[in-house]
């Protein structure tokens, strides 16, 4: 089932320097909660400055949903330490609140009033809050409080030059974009390995079912927790963060212009369903527009092609201008075993897997083939640890044991690991391969199995509160390592100044400004 990558691996072993200079970045979301696990109702902590303009700490959907962002980094340890500093400083500056250590929230009732993230009075800030109002009215606020980790990854120019010859200008844009689309297609085919290893949401609180009947064979504990015994990541299931109305958009990942055209079409396509919500009610705007996507970011995807945008530029226009610059992997649950929600083992695994995805052959995929890849993902998400589980290839009927496919993949990853270790020194990548490949013979080693044992004992709430408390105490005590207190103070002041400048510069009334941007 795994494509034959032997030639590409042999090529890589002859050109190990092509992997020198991999760049990455991390984003981690987490809910601020009270000691009893309920959602914090306070505003964004003052010490963290302006969520609109802060370089490292912002908010996602809700005012209580923090998001930490590391700068682009070539050094894994430095990046993780930077992320830990952001957590340390925040833990010391949020009073008695703490960070929820799980992807799935617990003590939130459906219909509970969840305050949307607030960004001040500038048109840009108000637009961001209105977008969130639209998300709430379309999908419900509960779904939007699910949190995850995003891993951003780019291969060095040396890799593309070794692979594609001496490229520059428009030629480089085309070839590098084609290379990243290959990564994305392979990710759709084989990325289910991520929830298999690292999925950490095998259970949900009853509020997530919202009283609706479900065909899933949930088991229920006395404290009202629902779980599937072999599930890995319900966050990635239809109960979690997904969007059914987008499934027939037909966006494909074969060609830059085709992809962008599909995305641009979706933000212009009216939706009958969302038209029913209305645009305005009693003088209050309910969504930016009633199209399938209000803006491009609403497209739900487990992986995204990205380029850093210039001021006022849409994500798709940035891609058209310069091609794909990096990839954003969006399928990681919060790692409950790390105080910062992600660890070195995961980052090293993703490095290996991304390189493998760039090497393995990846035939073009139609939108129907893309839909077929969802079958494997769903199997792994809902019953990934089930003994004897099999997976298919695309829309074909042949089935292969997950256990064997996983081991075959790791045989390749081990060779990538040897190459990366040869240029970085040490055996860190090979060690990660040895640790993780054991999860196929022993699914009890996976994150989902480990966290489920705790959840069955003490419930999602009990587990979340215990981890949150332990991490709060740990992070508050740890000294900063890279950033200093004064760096945070300076960034707080600079971010508040930037927000103020934006608000002062806006002379156009929001309603007028919105007409141009909706």
From Swiss-Prot:
Q: Which EC numbers characterise this protein's activity in its record?
A: 6.3.2.2
Biological-process GO terms, alphabetical: glutathione biosynthetic process
Q: In which pathway does it act?
A: Sulfur metabolism; glutathione biosynthesis; glutathione from L-cysteine and L-glutamate: step 1/2
Q: Is-annotated flag, keyword Cytoplasm?
A: no
Q: Which UniProt keywords apply?
A: ATP-binding, Glutathione biosynthesis, Ligase, Nucleotide-binding
Gene Ontology MF term list: ATP binding; glutamate-cysteine ligase activity; metal ion binding
Q: Which GO terms describe its cellular component?
A: cytosol
What catalytic reaction does the record list? L-cysteine + L-glutamate + ATP = gamma-L-glutamyl-L-cysteine + ADP + phosphate + H(+)
Q: Which family does it belong to?
A: Belongs to the glutamate--cysteine ligase type 1 family. Type 1 subfamily.
Question: What NCBIfam families does UniProt report for this protein, alphabetically?
Answer: glu_cys_ligase (TIGR01434)
Name of this chain's protein: Glutamate--cysteine ligase
- Please report the organism this UniProt entry assigns to the protein: Shigella flexneri serotype 5b (strain 8401)
